[in-house]
């Protein structure tokens, strides 16, 4: 469909009285009205047009109410608050002809509302989305938190770059965890995404952009995150930990392997490792050693444990979780 046809189709559904485009189409028959949220705010005037060739005998209702709001092919409404949002339906002779769902996006003191998601405050305040990648394959996972349990939907879009975006495909959003935090329950949602034409060895010049649309009842909010894959790398823990006590010695030879999920070849995508021996009491001082090798000799006392974690050798991204094995 050409641009002109798109414009005609758009205005056959909703006409904007505001010159600032304070209403836009989220998806078919669903529109977001952007409102400055303060006492006595004027709101936005919206003119809805029934998608039908009929001209006469048309009436309008809101949601499940049978109350007739107006008649005629168009309906003019002043949207000021959530009571003005919802699904508007035009009817004729008891038959529904078309629908338009209006959602509200609040702006208070020039700042868009962030009521739906919880601020994770890591690595900094106002962090609503967090993302990690296990390797350089272009596959990554993002997650977010909310205390809302019902009437909640999410959709995710992603690309590399914004001016000339390159494809990133994201799967379905899933509820991945539930936790109790004091008197509140916290819900973690996540999504997995894959860059369509990833080149693991290439230098990244444009960041990945992730955009999450959140809808709670009739409230719309939008959250974004921008990053390079190299900045969100967090390897899986090293695997196959082996500990072999040395004869007539308190020392032990320990070894481990790269995680299966790490990029190959390992000669190019190299890891560095942090190893430590932890006594039975967590208050005991930990002896930590850093090495690029996959083996080491350590003093491993009775009732202690040996642990190792991994990090990209050439870029200071996140360390993996610890992998551990008892000393005896």
From Swiss-Prot:
CDD domains: FN3. Keywords: Cytokine, Disulfide bond, Glycoprotein, Immunoglobulin domain, Secreted, Signal. Coiled coil: none annotated. It holds the Pfam family IL12p40_C. Glycans are attached at residues 125, 135, 222, 303. This is Interleukin-12 subunit beta. Residues 237-328 form the Fibronectin type-III domain. Residues 1-22 form the signal peptide. GO terms for molecular function: cytokine activity; cytokine receptor activity. PROSITE patterns: FN3, HEMATOPO_REC_L_F3, IG_LIKE. InterPro entries: FN3_dom (IPR003961), FN3_sf (IPR036116), Hematopoietin_rcpt_L_F3_CS (IPR003530), Ig-like_dom (IPR007110), Ig-like_dom_sf (IPR036179), Ig-like_fold (IPR013783), Ig_sub2 (IPR003598), IL-12 (IPR050676). One of its GO terms (cellular component) is extracellular space. Belongs to the IL-12B family. Residues 29-106 form the Ig-like C2-type domain. PANTHER family: INTERLEUKIN-12 SUBUNIT BETA, INTERLEUKIN-12 SUBUNIT BETA-RELATED. Heterodimer with IL12A; disulfide-linked. The heterodimer is known as interleukin IL-12. Heterodimer with IL23A; disulfide-linked. The heterodimer is known as interleukin IL-23. Also secreted as a monomer. Interacts with NBR1; this interaction promotes IL-12 secretion. It is found in: Secreted. It comes from Papio anubis (Olive baboon). Cytokine that can act as a growth factor for activated T and NK cells, enhance the lytic activity of NK/lymphokine-activated killer cells, and stimulate the production of IFN-gamma by resting PBMC. Associates with IL23A to form the IL-23 interleukin, a heterodimeric cytokine which functions in innate and adaptive immunity. IL-23 may constitute with IL-17 an acute response to infection in peripheral tissues. IL-23 binds to a heterodimeric receptor complex composed of IL12RB1 and IL23R, activates the Jak-Stat signaling cascade, stimulates memory rather than naive T-cells and promotes production of pro-inflammatory cytokines. IL-23 induces autoimmune inflammation and thus may be responsible for autoimmune inflammatory diseases and may be important for tumorigenesis. Disulfide bonds join 50-90.
């Amino acid at each position: 469909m050409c641009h002109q046809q798109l414009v005609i189709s758009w205005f056959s559904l909703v006409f904007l009285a505001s010159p600032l485009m304070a209403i836009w189409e989220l998806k078919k028959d669903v529109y977001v009205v952007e409102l400055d949220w303060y006492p006595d705010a004027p709101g936005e005037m919206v003119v809805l047009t029934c998608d039908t060739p009929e001209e006469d005998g048309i009436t309008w209702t809101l949601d499940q109410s049978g109350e007739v709001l107006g008649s005629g092919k168009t309906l003019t409404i002043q949207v000021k608050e959530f009571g003005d949002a919802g699904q508007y339906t035009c009817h004729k002779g008891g038959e529904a002809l078309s629908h338009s769902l209006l959602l509200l996006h609040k702006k208070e003191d020039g700042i868009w509302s962030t009521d739906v998601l919880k601020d994770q405050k890591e690595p900094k305040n106002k962090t609503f989305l967090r993302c990690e990648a296990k390797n350089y394959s272009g596959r990554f996972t993002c997650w977010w938190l909310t205390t809302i349990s019902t009437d909640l939907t999410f959709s995710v879009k992603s690309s590399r770059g914004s001016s000339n975006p390159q494809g990133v495909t994201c799967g379905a959003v899933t509820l991945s965890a539930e936790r109790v935090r004091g008197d509140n329950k916290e819900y973690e949602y996540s999504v997995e995404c894959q860059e369509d034409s990833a080149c693991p060895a290439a230098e990244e010049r444009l960041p990945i952009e992730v955009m999450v649309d959140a809808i709670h009842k009739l409230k719309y909010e939008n959250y974004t995150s921008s990053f390079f894959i190299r900045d969100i790398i967090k390897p899986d823990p090293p695997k196959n930990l082996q500990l072999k006590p040395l004869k007539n010695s308190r020392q032990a030879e320990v070894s481990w392997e790269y995680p299966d999920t790490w990029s190959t070849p390992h000669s190019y995508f190299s890891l560095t490792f942090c190893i430590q021996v932890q006594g039975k009491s967590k208050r005991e001082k930990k002896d930590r050693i850093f090495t690029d090798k996959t083996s080491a000799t350590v003093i491993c006392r009775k009732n202690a444990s040996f642990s190792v974690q991994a990090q990209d050798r050439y870029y200071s991204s996140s360390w993996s979780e610890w992998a551990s094995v008892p000393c005896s």
